[in-house]
C-alpha cells in the first residue's frame, strides 16, 4: 500500500521514462532565457541538475518553480558556452563549396584553408565511462568548405504555453570545436563577429539547445506535465562544484544514443549501467559494526512500483545492506538486521524468476531483482538456510489456513497472505494484490449484511455474474479456432492500469508515469462506486476485481497491515484517502459536464471512512466467511486454469498465466520487449497455490467454541505460570533465610539455587508476555465474532452443511438420506456407539494440566484399543495377546477376561449402553461380545486376511478394513432379544488399495468414511452412494491413524514416521507438522490433538496450530518413558473434566486426569 506522499523531495524516479536510469545529480545554476545575458544572470535560479539516461532534469531549490525535463531526443546539441557563436553553424557542414571571391581579399592570394575540427562521437561499443579522446586527436578529412554567412538574431518567439521569453537561434547545429592549431583566416573572420559572452565571463557555462521542455511538479503539485515547444532555444547552466567537461561528456554520449533505435539504445545504456556497477563497490566504512564479516557482495536492483533502481547488495553475518548506484534516496544506504527478516519469498519480475522479496518484523518489505535465477537462488538459500534464524516455519501456509479456519486470522489478513504466497506484491503494479468485489448493492440507503442478496456471488468470476454477458463471452469462445488458445475474457481482473484507476487520487505520480505525463480520459476515470460496479457487471471489456485498499481495517497499523507485503511508509495512511481528491488534482470534466473530484459513494456510506469500514464488515461477515473459499478456488486454486476453469467460466487469455511462455527463450529483442509489454498490459494471473478445492471456514459457532477453549487454556497457562513464579519467590525467600542462618556452610548451594531461580524467572516472564498477547488477540477476535446475530449463525451452519456436501460431488438427494437416518435412529434409539458421537457432544477443554493417576497392568502384549465407560468407572481393552479385558476402577479389579481366539485382537467398538462389543481379530473374523453374558453372541468371517480396523456408526453401518487391502461396509441389526447381529454379506466391498488397510473412520453425520493404507494413501468413500469419491497420496510411509474432527469437515491423518496432516474433506491439506518418534495412535476433539508415539505423548492445538510444550504440561514429559500404542480421551460425567487413558507396548494402562 502506498503512502499519500511518495517522497519528501520533489524529484523521484517515477518522473523518468520507462526503462530510464538515474545516474547522478549536481548542484547547478540555471540562467533563464532572456533578452540579454545580463538579464539571465539577474534571474538565475539555484537548483540541481539530474543526469538520467534519456533526459536531463533541472530541479530548482524553490519548490514553487517547476522541475524542467529536457529529453535528449529533443536536443540538437549540448556544449560549452563560450560566446554568441558557441551554438553557431553545425560542425557537420554540407558538401564543401568554393569560397566566394567576395569574402576573400582580392589583393591577397587565396590562403590554403584549414579543415574544421569536429568532435568524434563515442563508439557504440565503448564503455560510456571510458575517457573521450582529446580534441587535438579528433580531426575529419573534410575539404575546404564555403564559410557560412552570419545569421542575424531573429525576433523572440512565443512558446505554446506560459514560459520565460526565450531568444531563439533558428539554425540546427551540433557542437563546434576550436582547433588547437592556428585558425584559418576564414575562422578568424568569423570569431571577430562573435559577441563577448557576459555569462562566460562569470565562469564555465554550458548550453542545451532543445525544441521541447517538459515542466512538472510546480508548487510541488502533481499536475499533468506541461509540454512547451521551442524553436531550438539555448538553455544555459553552470555547475557549482564539478568540472563541466566531465558531466558534458556523459550527457553527449546519452544524446548520441537518443538518435538510435530503441532496442540498440537500451542495450548501449544497459552496458553503461553494468560498466558503472562493475566499478562501484560497497563502502565498507558504512558498516554498522566494523566487526561484521562480509559473506556475499553482488549487483542487484531494488524494485518499487514502476521503478527499478540498480545498486549493490552486501550480506554480512549480522546485516543485509543495499547501496543504490545513485544518491536519489534520502537515506542512501539501507541496512537490515538479519534477525528482523521473518520471511523470504522468491518472486517473478518481468516474467522471469529473478526476484526476491524480504519481509521484516516491522511490516516493511524489500523487493530485489538479480541478473539471473542462479544468483537469486544463491541469495535465497544463504538467507533462509544459514543466516536468518527468525524465518517462519516451512509449514506456515498450512498454519495460516488453520488459523483462518478457526477465526484467529481474519478474512482480510488471509487474503493478503494468499496474495503474498501467490507472488502478488505491493512493490510491483503488474502483480498487485487482488481482492474480490463483495457487495452487490450500491443503491440502498442502508447496507443490510443479513440479506444474501446484498452480496456478490463468490462462486462465480466477475465475468460470469451477468448471464447475458456471459453468453456473449461463450459465443466468442466457441468461435475461436481449435488450433488457437481459447479464452472467455480478453481482459483481466488485475492490471497496472486498473490498480492506478483506483489509486490515481492517492498516487497521481504513478498515473502520470503510466500515461506519459497525463491523466486518463475523464470519461474513463474512477468517478462513482455504483458506476464502476455496473461496468464490471455489464461491460464486455471490464472484469476487474478490487484491491486491498477497499477493505483495509481502521484499526490496522502499518506494521501489521500487509503480512510484510507493504510498500513505502504509510503510518499516516487514512482509510479511504484514495477516494478523495485531497490534492485538488485537475482530473478533468466528463461528457456530462460533471467535474471529477471525490468519488461518489453509495447512499449507505456517509464518508469514505464509513464506506471502507462497512466494506470491511462485509468482508468479515458470516456469508463471506462461508463462501470465500469459492472465490479462492477461482483466483488461487484449482479452478484457475485448465478444464476446471472452463467449467467454472473462468478462462482468461493464455498469456496471463504463469509459465505460458518462456521469456528466456525469445532471443529477438524486439519480440521479447513486445511480449513483456503485452503481458504486462493484459495482466498476470496469480501463481496457482491450491490444486484441490480450498477448505471452507468453520461455522461461526464452532469458531467461537474453539476460541473459547483456546482462551481458557491460555488463562490456565498464565495461572500455572504465576503459581510457579510464587513458588520460586517462596523458595528464594527460604533460601535467603537459610543464607542468613548458615552463611558459611551453604554458599555453593545458595548460588545454585539463585541461578536456577533466575532461569525460571526469565522463562516465566517470557511465557507471561506471550500468553497475555495471545489472550488479547483471541479476546478481540472472540468479541468481534460475537457481534453477529444468532440467526446468522443458524443460517450459516445450514449453508455450511450444504456447501460441504456439494463440494464433494454428492448427489442432491440428501433429504432422502437424512430421512432414512432419522427412521433408523427412531427404530434403534438405544443403539449408538462411543467415538465421534460422545466427543461431539462434549469438548475436552484443556488437557494441559493432566496428572498421572495410576497404572494398571492388564495385558501381556501391546494394547491395540481401549475405551472408558460413560460413568468413568470401567475400562475396556483389547490386546495383541488375543484377550479382551474389562476392569472396574471403582472396585479396582478385573471384571472380565476373555481369550477370544489364538490370534491378536486389533480393534473394537463399544455400544452406548455398554452391553455389546464388536471386535476385529487377526484370525479374519468379526466378533460380537455380550458383556452381560460374558460370551461371544455372534461372529462372521470378515475378510480373507487379518481384520486391522473397525468403525461403527449409529445408523447401523459398520466399516471394516483388512490386511487383504479391502474395505467392507456392513449393515448391523438389533435382534428381538436385544442382541446385535451383522448381515453376513457386506453391502459394499472396495478393493481400491494396493496394500493393507491400517485405519478407518466415519464422519459424524455418517455421509463419508475414510480409509488409510500402509503405502500412505487416503481413500474417501460416500456412504450414501457407496462409491469412491477420491484418492489422495498423503505420505510416503505407512499411514497409521485417521480421525475425523467432530464437525465432520476435516480429517486428521498420521504417518508412522511422525508426520501429521489435517486435511479437508475436499482433499486440501490444511495443516501439517512432524513429531519426534514413531506415531501409533491419536485422538482429537477438533480443538486439541493428543498423539501417542514410541517416545510418549505429544499435545497440539488445532486452533492455533502450535505444540503444547511439556514445560506447560508436565504430564507429557512423564509419559516419555513409555511407548504409547493406544489412547482414549473422555469426559468425567461428575467433574466434567477430561480423563486420558493410554495403553503401552508392554500391556499396561495409565490413567491421567485433573
From Swiss-Prot:
Amino acid composition bias (Low complexity), ranges on this chain: 779-788, 795-822
UniProt-annotated stretches for the region Disordered: 92-123, 139-167, 554-575, 739-762, 779-825
Residue ranges with Pro residues bias: 145-158
Name of the protein in question: BEACH domain-containing protein lvsF
Alphabetic keyword roster: Repeat, WD repeat
Record-linked Pfam families: Beach (PF02138), NBCH_WD40 (PF20426), PH_BEACH (PF14844), PH_FAN (PF25400)
Ranges for the WD repeats: 858-897, 900-939, 942-980, 992-1031, 1034-1074, 1076-1110, 1119-1154
CDD domains hit by this protein: Beach (cd06071), PH_BEACH (cd01201), WD40 (cd00200)
PROSITE patterns: BEACH, PH_BEACH, WD_REPEATS_2, WD_REPEATS_REGION
Annotated BEACH domain residues: 389-697
Domain of life according to the entry: Eukaryota
Domain spans labelled BEACH-type PH: 289-384
